[in-house]
A protein has these predicted regions:
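Long, compositionally biased stretches enriched for glycine and/or charged residues
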Residues: 1-157
Length: 157
């Protein structure tokens, strides 16, 4: 998933392969009817809520494990090449923290734009718009400074 976290996640399935066959060729067939794919996407987006429902609390093991793997990558271990939240400022998305196609290694965090279908990219655009709205609300409430002043706090932004 890319973009925001929670209901505004952009679930990308177009690069997934099942037994060597692209998922996009399976969706809408008897093997994976469109309705089942939609349910699967919903289950991915609502996975955290399901864990809380089943356990009565959030899961801490997976984030803890990923954190250790991220630290290991930055310290010289195998690169961590899973989507992760990163500060994004490019031609399309400006001044936002969102999950991207990232790699963490001894050079830090780098990202590239996810590649997806037009529908997936539209979901990512919608997720970005939602994140911008949330960011702008935080600015309005004086919780964070206006974007144009961020580089006063961190000159790398």
């Amino acid at each position: 998933t890319y973009g925001g976290h929670g209901e505004q996640m952009a679930v990308f399935g177009s690069k997934v392969k099942i037994q060597g066959k692209p998922l996009s060729e399976i969706i809408g067939t008897d093997a994976l009817p469109q309705e089942e794919w939609e349910k699967l996407r919903t289950d991915v987006v609502q996975g955290g809520a399901k864990i809380i429902q089943l356990r009565g609390r959030s899961s801490w093991q997976s984030p803890a494990y990923c954190s250790v793997e991220m630290i290991r990558a930055i310290m010289g271990g195998e690169p961590f090449a899973w989507p992760a939240g990163t500060y994004v400022k490019n031609e399309k998305y400006q001044n936002i923290m969102m999950a991207m196609d990232t790699t963490l290694d001894t050079n830090g965090c780098t990202y590239k734009m996810p590649e997806g279908t037009p529908e997936e990219m539209a979901l990512l655009d919608a997720s970005y718009a939602h994140l911008c709205k949330m960011r702008d609300e935080l600015v309005t409430l004086n919780i964070v400074p206006p974007v144009e002043k961020w580089n006063e706090i961190n000159p790398n932004l």
